[in-house]
Amino acid sequence: MTKLILIRHGQSVWNAENRFTGWVDVDLSDKGVQEAEKSGQIIKDLNIKIDIFYTSYLKRAIKTLTTILKKNSLDLKFNTAWQLNERHYGSLTGLNKEETKNKIGEVQFKKYRRSWDCLLYTSDAADDQCC
């Protein structure tokens, strides 16, 4: 039986700072490395065999995957695809999430964070009233 396993990258440096990250290529935090190691250990403990790996182009995702591979003594090639990158946050990129929520309100903040059909512009975040 074919199985699909999805693993989100470990905590990034900007996740730890509560910042919108999107496509900015930030590294894992120390906690993120530990989370990746734990994921690798779970896969090892459950004796899960994986045939093919895909990851985004972002180093936090690649480092999560390579940590998992190392934990399982695997030296396998993996595929990267920009389509697996995190969503692009436009003008919100780099901003503190809590400060942004306080500025634009809870309703608009949730739309920006969770809507799949909302495009964020590269202008001032206050002008991004598209969703």
Please provide the spans of the model-predicted regions.
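Short catalytic helix/loop segments, enriched in acidic residues and glycine
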Residues: 24-38
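Phosphate-coordination/substrate-recognition cap region in phosphate-metabolizing enzymes
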Residues: 39-110, 117-119
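Conserved protein kinase catalytic core
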Residues: 15, 88-89, 130
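Extreme N-terminal starter segment of soluble prokaryotic enzymes
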Residues: 1-5
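Single conserved hydrophobic/aromatic residue that forms the stacking wall/gate
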Residues: 121-131
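Glycine-rich N-terminal loop/short-helix segment of MobA-like nucleotidyltransferase
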Residues: 12-26
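Active-site glycine-centered loops adjacent to acidic/histidine catalytic or metal-binding residues
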Residues: 9
